[in-house]
Structure formats: structure tokens, C-alpha cells
Amino acid sequence: MEIFSYIIIAVVAYLLGNISTSYIVAKRIAGVDIRTQGSGNAGSTNVLRTLGKRAGAMTFLGDVLKGVMAVLISEFAARLVGIDTLLAGYLAVICVVAGHNWPAVLGFRGGKGVATSLGAMLAVNPVITLMCLAVFILVVAITKYVSLGSVVGIGCSPIFMIMVKNKAGLIVALFLTASVIYNHRANIKRLLNGTERKIGQKKE
């Protein structure tokens, strides 16, 4: 019964992740498929760069909310059936981010998972999430590179989990870090060769 409950929670969280805010916003505002615009990524940064601040903010907030809701729904369901709420929450984090990054409904072409990771982890472990967010803001403020801030910010999460001796959280943090690095591999290459765009920099 417990295993079945966790499977249901995982599936529901993954399906929530499949709700692509960027796709919906781009279709509503500009009538375009965001995957054919800019970098081709179905994420808030690409929406911001191609459709403007309003659309970018809507996408970012939608992705964050999606992560929060996945965890809250999972923890509520866990309480109802009497299973571990923390484990259910962490499982939801992994699955909602996986659903966002690799959505079945969009041919497994999704976003990079930063905003959804932020929302999901904020719901399950707010203190560490805010610490990672502070690192992100600091790195972006200094370098003007959103991609670098994303990688470094989430990359700090395993370190923070080790510091507080949170083994379950460490596993989730390692997954999030690996997925963000993987999805930012093109950005990392551009950072290394000096061609990555900074905030406000126009595409040449």
C-alpha cells in the first residue's frame, strides 16, 4: 500500500511538471511555440529574452508555483494515507522537476528546471532554498550571467545538505544539481569560450 501511494504521488508530481508555463504563456501572448523561438528552450529565461519582461515574469512565477503545488499536494496526500510526508515531498521535488525538464506532452522537450526546482525545494526545505537563492542573486549581480548563477546556486545545495546532515535532502540536491548542469551544458560551453550572453545583452 505504501509503495502504491508513493507511485501515485510520483506520477501526479510528474504530470504537474508537464504543465509548461512557457508554452502556455507564449501561445497566449504571442501565438508562438516557445520551442521555435530564441534558444528553443521552454523555460522562463528564453521567454524573457524573446517575449519580454511581463511574459518572462509570468512564466517564472508559474514554474515556481508548479513546484510548490506539487510538494504541497504530495505532502497533503501523504498525511491522508499515513505515509512519510518528508519522503513524499522530496519524491515530488524530483518528479515535478523531471516532468518540467522532460515533459511527455511536449515530446520530452522542456525547460532547464531552475524555477521549478526553486519552488519545489522552497516548499520542502525553505531555509536551504533561500540560501541557494542568495548565492544565485550574488553570482548574477557580480557576473551578470543567469546561467552561471543557476548552476552555482543549485550546485551549493548538496553542500548545504551535507552541512545540516540531511541525507534524503542530499540525494535530491544531487539530482537537481546534475539535472541543472546537464541542461546548462551548452551555456557552460559558452561561458568557457566567452560567448554566453549577459543580462540585457542583445543577441549579435
From Swiss-Prot:
Keywords: Cell membrane, Lipid biosynthesis, Lipid metabolism, Membrane, Phospholipid biosynthesis, Phospholipid metabolism, Transferase, Transmembrane, Transmembrane helix
GO biological process: phospholipid biosynthetic process
Signal peptide annotation: none
Main location: membrane
Catalytic activity: an acyl phosphate + sn-glycerol 3-phosphate = a 1-acyl-sn-glycero-3-phosphate + phosphate
UniProt EC number: 2.3.1.275
Cellular component terms per the entry's GO annotation: plasma membrane
Record-level Gene Ontology MF annotations: acyl-phosphate glycerol-3-phosphate acyltransferase activity
EC main group: transferase
Pathway the protein takes part in: Lipid metabolism; phospholipid metabolism
Membrane topology: Multi-pass membrane protein
UniProt subcellular location: Cell membrane
Coiled-coil positions: none
InterPro entries membership: G3P_acylTferase_PlsY (IPR003811)
Keyword Membrane included in the entry's annotation: yes
Transmembrane intervals: 6-26, 80-100, 122-142, 144-164, 168-188
Subunit record text: Probably interacts with PlsX.
Job of this protein: Catalyzes the transfer of an acyl group from acyl-phosphate (acyl-PO(4)) to glycerol-3-phosphate (G3P) to form lysophosphatidic acid (LPA). This enzyme utilizes acyl-phosphate as fatty acyl donor, but not acyl-CoA or acyl-ACP.
Family: Belongs to the PlsY family.
Protein's UniProt name: Glycerol-3-phosphate acyltransferase
Organism of this sequence: Clostridioides difficile (strain 630) (Peptoclostridium difficile)
Organism classification: Bacteria, Bacillati, Bacillota, Clostridia, Peptostreptococcales
Gene name tied to this protein: plsY
